[in-house]
Swiss-Prot record:
Keywords: Ribonucleoprotein, Ribosomal protein. It comes from the Archaea. One of its GO terms (biological process) is translation. This is Large ribosomal subunit protein eL21. The keyword Oxidoreductase does not apply. It comes from Sulfurisphaera tokodaii (strain DSM 16993 / JCM 10545 / NBRC 100140 / 7). InterPro entries: Ribosomal_eL21 (IPR001147), Ribosomal_eL21_arc (IPR022856), Ribosomal_eL21_CS (IPR018259), Ribosomal_eL21_sf (IPR036948), Translation_prot_SH3-like_sf (IPR008991). One of its GO terms (molecular function) is structural constituent of ribosome. Belongs to the eukaryotic ribosomal protein eL21 family. The lineage of its organism: Archaea, Thermoproteota, Thermoprotei, Sulfolobales, Sulfolobaceae. HAMAP family: Ribosomal_eL21. Transmembrane segments: none annotated. PROSITE patterns: RIBOSOMAL_L21E. GO terms for cellular component: ribonucleoprotein complex; ribosome. The keyword Ribonucleoprotein applies.
Length: 103
């Protein structure tokens, strides 16, 4: 028997794949230039072609609040179950949240 690997990107075969039309290494420039202010709600949307500043797969699709900035990356507060987590994510993996946030 072969031992099961437990790397950082395990179980991401479908999660970290792009649509055929979206393939390519370079993200849109507008995506990289997007600025977020403290208190903004954002969705963590992992871009698999950019490995820098990529959060763990468990945070994909979660809504968080911008707490601040660290270099080019943002400090995001995310609720995971009953705990609050603080993660550092680059803007390539963030999108503005357009829905209504209760709370």
């Amino acid at each position: 028997m072969v031992k099961h690997s437990k790397g950082y990107r395990t179980r991401t075969r479908k999660l970290l794949t792009k649509n055929v039309r979206e393939r390519g290494a370079v993200p849109r420039l507008s995506l990289l230039m997007e600025e977020f202010k403290e208190g903004d709600y954002v969705v963590i949307k992992i871009n698999p072609s950019v490995h820098k500043g990529m959060p763990h797969r468990r945070y994909h699709g979660k809504v968080g609040v911008i707490q601040g900035k660290r270099g080019k990356a943002y400090i995001v507060r995310v609720t995971l179950g009953d705990k609050e987590k603080v993660i550092i994510v680059r803007p390539e993996h963030l999108a503005k949240f357009n829905g209504i946030k209760n709370g």
